[in-house]
């Protein structure tokens, strides 16, 4: 169903609402657990719905880069590439171009929505590209499939990911496995990967409600679980193909948190230009594509 710019997909178990005009974001992801409806992701705020602002959504795609680009530039093929700020409160560009665009609906059915957009190198990321995001409803959740295509005549560096916002209950627990964590100290931030120590091990699960962190993990194996015991629900995340990094952001003073499957480290363009290995940055030639999928599925405890 299409309602005020929202495209709603649902079945007896779950439902989502896609916002083409708000960066191909989601307005909600809800599940029927027992006799009640539970918000699996933070519902879009009223202001975000009015303003078509993905920042206040349930989830948005990040492309053609993820998180921040330090000081708004990077060097590629020996050329300094400027990337303008896209957030008024931050001098550095943030989370790519896609979440700021109004997307076109390419295909729509009861179970699937396909959205497309084109990046203008004169206004944002300094390379020409086409992006496609597909949301497909499943019996227990939905899948997100992202495709990036280089429309230019030169190789294009790129990264992508998804940025969901989750409710932070007092008992929320997250479980995932990673091989390393990117350093927090120094300028620019997060410029070295270190082997994961016990403080950063989440494979057995950790309660995160009282944590404060903004951390990128490398060597992410693609599987994660978020459990809300008080809501009697668990979310399983399965990230495929290129999603070998993840970012966990938690603030003790906020009632939401994010766990973001991504293809690269934070500020990866600049890290790679300095010869740092393992950043996850990809380079695609003219006409070439990169694509990856993330699955979200809900189960009752």
Give the label of every model feature segment.
Residues 1-12:
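Short, Gly/Pro- and small/polar-rich lid/capping loops
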Residues 8, 79, 84-139:
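Extended, loop-rich substrate-binding clefts of extracytoplasmic carbohydrate-active enzymes
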Residues 9, 20, 33, 117-158, ...:
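Acidic, contiguous internal or C-terminal segments within carbohydrate-active enzymes
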Residues 19-80, 86, 258:
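Acidic-aromatic substrate-binding/catalytic surfaces of carbohydrate-active enzymes
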Residues 33, 75-79, 105-113, 136-141, ...:
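A short, structured loop/turn motif at beta-sheet edges
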Residues 74-82, 146, 282-299:
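Short Pro-Gly-centered flexible turn/kink motifs
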Residues 82-83, 155-156, 165-241:
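Active-site/ligand-binding surface loops and adjacent short beta/alpha elements
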Residues 91-106, 173-174, 208-279:
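Acidic/His-leaning functional-site neighborhoods
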């Amino acid at each position: 169903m299409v309602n005020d710019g929202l495209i709603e997909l649902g079945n007896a178990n779950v439902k989502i609402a896609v916002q083409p005009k708000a960066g191909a974001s989601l307005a909600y992801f809800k599940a029927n657990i027992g006799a009640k409806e539970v918000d699996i992701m933070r519902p879009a705020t009223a202001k975000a719905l009015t303003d078509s602002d993905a920042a206040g959504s349930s989830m948005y795609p990040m492309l053609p880069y993820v998180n921040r680009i330090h000081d708004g530039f990077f060097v590629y093929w020996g050329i300094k590439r400027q990337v303008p700020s896209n957030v008024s409160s931050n001098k550095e560009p943030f989370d790519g171009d896609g979440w700021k665009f109004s997307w076109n609906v390419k295909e729509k059915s009861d179970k699937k929505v396909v959205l497309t957009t084109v990046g203008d190198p004169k206004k944002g990321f300094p390379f020409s590209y086409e992006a496609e995001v597909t949301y497909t409803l499943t019996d227990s959740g939905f899948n997100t499939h992202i495709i990036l295509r280089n429309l230019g005549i030169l190789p294009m560096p790129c990264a992508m990911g998804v940025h969901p916002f989750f409710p932070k209950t007092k008992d929320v627990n997250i479980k995932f496995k990673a091989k390393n964590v990117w350093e927090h100290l120094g300028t620019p931030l997060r410029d070295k990967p270190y082997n994961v120590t016990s403080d950063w091990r989440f494979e057995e699960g950790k309660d995160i409600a009282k944590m404060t962190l903004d951390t990128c993990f490398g060597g992410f194996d693609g599987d994660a679980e978020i459990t809300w015991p008080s809501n009697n629900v668990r979310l399983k995340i399965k990230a495929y193909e290129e999603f070998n990094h993840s970012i966990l952001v938690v603030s003790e003073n906020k009632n939401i948190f994010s766990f973001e499957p991504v293809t690269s480290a934070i500020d990866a363009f600049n890290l790679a230009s300095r010869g740092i290995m393992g950043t996850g940055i990809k380079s695609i030639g003219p006409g070439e594509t990169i694509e990856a999928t993330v699955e979200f599925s809900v189960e009752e405890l």
